[in-house]
Amino acid sequence: MQLLSRIVLAAVLLHLTPVFAQAPKKAVASPELQKEFDGFVGKFRAALKANDSAAVAGMTRLPFMADSSIRDAAQFRAKTYPAIFTAKHRACLQRGKAVYDRDGENNDNYFIFCGQTIFVFTKTPTGFLFTETGVND
């Protein structure tokens, strides 16, 4: 009887293994969220196409990346915009596909990958904003 119990237990555990081994489900944005982001990114891309640093600063969460030296639009335009939004990155952001995901704090984010740089756009209480860049590793 003890042997039969062990065999049944082993069979049950083997049967459950694929359930735990499955890849996590990929996050999918709701149609409403996607529509909101599409509207935002259209305006963001138009500002980049015009090389309008003031408009981009207005669509950016400040202080940028929690850096107190980039706490307002003037500082963003002077320090960050020229360094991050090179002609190459502006062109990439025009054509780059945005990828949706949720972060560990359950925030809705879209990412656009441009070479070694990731551009992050986050849903905030006031709508979507450009929130940070990161290294594409």
Predicted regions, residues:
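Hydrophobic helical h-region of N-terminal Sec-dependent signal peptides
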Residues: L9-L14
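N-terminal signal peptide c-region/cleavage motif recognized by signal peptidases
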Residues: L16-P18
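C-terminal-biased regions
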Residues: P24-K49, S53, A57-D137
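Bacterial N-terminal signal peptides that target proteins for export
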Residues: M1-V8
